[in-house]
């Protein structure tokens, strides 16, 4: 899928000196926000059977409200007091994708309407934060290369020192102020960390924290809007340290639970949409409508991969309750049928490689079987090796 995105971008020139667009990325465009906003967008389009939409349409949809409140610990999306914050939360990712030519924007009066230019890339972004991050990395590098300032970033990545960071930051500010309507450093400095840290994380490099050169290599958590650390939650006035710590940790735990629930439900919906009512396992029990989403490696035993698409497979009720789980006992797994599910899933992953990830499938196998395969392994060899493993255990 990365190759497809790169090929698609070759049709466009994102040179800031020509577009004068300083907001090709904005503050709210983080991997987690971008992914969930696009998931909300695609869900809204499907539910309403429309081609054109506004950010307000997405913001006020039931699906957005159900998930944003719990996952981000926010108030109701229709709360008037939160309107300004939510407008940015939903609008900025859509604007960024319009800049990237994934969406098309049309202004009529004061309202901006969006339509889809590349659904495949949108679906890829919506699947998981990891995909969203891959997209942002490709897009940002493309913008900076087209604008002939990539060498400034490359120099910093090759020689990550405070002096080189300061030089990069100043040169970027000068460039943006010179070629876009932004005329002050403050606004440039709000957006710069989102750009640098996204690129830094992918390259395992230093970046920027609170406007300064980071002492450590940028971590994934630094990129996210939804920081999953209780210390990021503010202490309330009059609250004791113990009360604050207990409340903050509970809030973070509730957010984590909500996020796992959301990702699992999203994964199940994606699989049903991909495979419709046809079982992924072709055997004598595949007749009839496939309605059951089965965890190849049990959710109770392997919670860390419970919401991975590559660990979920669509089966008929007969397959699920008589083959995958012997005698309808969902606490047991039929190892022979587990192998069939893995082999069938590998076929699905090859067929729908813009949705599934071979790398994530290998991770699922690593957790479930405690066996590591190299990322370079071909699917034919992988299938043969899986058969060997199950036949010798």
Model segments located where?
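Mixed-charge, low-complexity interaction segments
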Residues: 2-263, 332-340, 346
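Acidic/proline-rich low-complexity IDRs
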Residues: 24, 49, 273, 381, ...
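Short amphipathic alpha-helical surface micro-motifs
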Residues: 85-86, 96, 271-278, 294-297
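Short, flexible loop/turn elements at secondary-structure junctions
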Residues: 101, 295-300, 316-320, 390
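Short beta-strand element of the conserved SAM-dependent methyltransferase core
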Residues: 114, 314-316
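Short cysteine-rich loop/turn motifs with clustered Cys
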Residues: 253-292, 316-319
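Histidine-centered nuclease catalytic patch
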Residues: 276-313, 323-328, 335
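C-terminal structured domain segments
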Residues: 310, 317-393
């Amino acid at each position: 899928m990365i190759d497809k995105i790169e090929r698609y971008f070759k049709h466009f020139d994102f040179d800031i000196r020509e577009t004068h667009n300083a907001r090709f990325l904005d503050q709210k465009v983080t991997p987690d926000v971008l992914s969930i906003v696009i998931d909300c967008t695609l869900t809204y389009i499907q539910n309403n059977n429309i081609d054109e939409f506004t950010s307000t349409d997405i913001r006020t949809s039931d699906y957005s409200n159900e998930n944003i409140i719990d996952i981000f610990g926010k108030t109701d999306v229709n709360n008037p007091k939160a309107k300004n914050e939510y407008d940015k939360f939903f609008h900025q990712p859509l604007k960024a994708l319009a800049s990237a030519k994934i969406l098309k924007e049309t202004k009529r009066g004061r309202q901006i309407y969006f339509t889809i230019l590349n659904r495949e890339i949108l679906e890829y972004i919506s699947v998981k934060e990891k995909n969203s991050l891959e997209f942002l990395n490709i897009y940002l590098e493309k913008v900076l290369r087209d604008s002939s300032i990539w060498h400034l970033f490359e120099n910093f990545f090759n020689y990550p020192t405070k002096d080189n960071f300061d030089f990069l930051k100043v040169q970027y500010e000068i460039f943006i102020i010179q070629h876009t309507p932004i005329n002050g450093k403050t606004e440039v400095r709000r957006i710069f960390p989102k750009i640098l840290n996204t690129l830094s994380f992918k390259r395992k490099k230093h970046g920027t924290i609170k406007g300064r050169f980071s002492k450590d290599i940028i971590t994934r958590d630094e990129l996210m809007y939804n920081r999953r650390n209780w210390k990021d939650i503010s202490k309330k006035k009059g609250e004791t340290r113990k009360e604050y710590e207990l409340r903050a940790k509970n809030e973070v735990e509730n957010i984590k639970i909500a996020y796992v629930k959301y990702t699992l439900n999203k994964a199940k919906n994606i699989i049903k949409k991909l495979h419709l009512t046809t079982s992924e396992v072709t055997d004598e029990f595949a007749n009839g409508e496939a309605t059951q989403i089965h965890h190849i490696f049990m959710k109770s035993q392997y919670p860390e991969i419970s919401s991975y698409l590559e660990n979920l497979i669509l089966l008929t009720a007969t397959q699920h309750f008589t083959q995958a789980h012997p005698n309808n006992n969902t606490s047991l797994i039929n190892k022979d049928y587990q192998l069939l599910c893995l082999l069938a899933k590998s076929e699905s992953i090859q067929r729908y490689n813009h949705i599934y990830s071979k790398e994530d499938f290998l991770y699922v196998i690593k957790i479930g079987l405690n066996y590591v395969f190299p990322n370079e392994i071909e699917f034919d060899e992988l299938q043969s090796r899986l058969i060997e493993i199950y036949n010798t255990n």
